Swiss-Prot record:
It comes from the Bacteria. Its EC number is 2.1.1.228. PANTHER family: TRNA (GUANINE-N(1)-)-METHYLTRANSFERASE. It comes from Hahella chejuensis (strain KCTC 2396). The lineage of its organism: Bacteria, Pseudomonadati, Pseudomonadota, Gammaproteobacteria, Oceanospirillales. The gene is trmD. This is tRNA (guanine-N(1)-)-methyltransferase.
Amino acid sequence: LIGIRISEVWFGVITLFPEMLKSVTDFGVVGKAIKQSSIEVCTWNPRDYATDNYRTVDDRPYGGGPGMLMKVGPLEAALNAAKSVAPAGSKVVYLSPQGRRLDQALARSALSVPGLILLCGRYEGIDERLIEDEVDEEWSLGDFVLSGGEIAAMAIIDSVSRLAPGVLGHNESAEQDSFENSLLDCPHYTRPEIYRDKRVPEVLLSGNHEKIRRWRLEQSLLRTLQRRPDLLEQRELSEEEAQIIQELRRGQLI
Ligand SMILES: NC(=O)c1ccc(NCc2ccccc2)nc1
């Protein structure tokens, strides 16, 4: 099938624990999208490329010190196997605390590459020479250490996949997502109307869609101003948003 792209988004994952990926491939909207082939997630396990009788995948660090690194041979072989089937122009992304912080913009930008090969480190990581020669980008979920890159890889697969066309139904559309307009989300309410002696805000029962839209925008701006004012610095405000923030600052003395 030359030139006919089967899936919208293609992920290759290099991991010693391929079973972990079932957490995203077997559940929810991403799981459904995989079943419908709009997403593809393939895994390669370096252990399958180990050449010794013990199938060794770790190796000692030069310079000594605690911990091990991923053994170069099996890792390189697994990476080459993934590259041989990845769509042309795929990017190799290494998940590590030393990487660029993932945010919605980075997730959205990942949609525009043909595929992502996600390299999941274990132990203390991988040989720097492999990073230099094979890794296009290093990404991080944040400033904390996990025992492996798999959870970070799954977060990327989920956050990118849900932005792909056709993955979310119209009633779960990603456009309305809070971080899609880089504001925090407004409060949400569902049945019953009175719950724990608290009522649902009247505007949400009014059926007045313009008033509801306005209220939700005000609530998002209030919440962003209170909890993440930094998000407002890097964002252009519409005329309406700027006016709401003025009111909030006066009213709320934030
Ligand atoms: N913050 C993150 O995104 C992250 C990614 C991976 C990870 N652990 C695996 C690993 C350990 C050391 C060196 C390279 C990879 N921990 C946290």
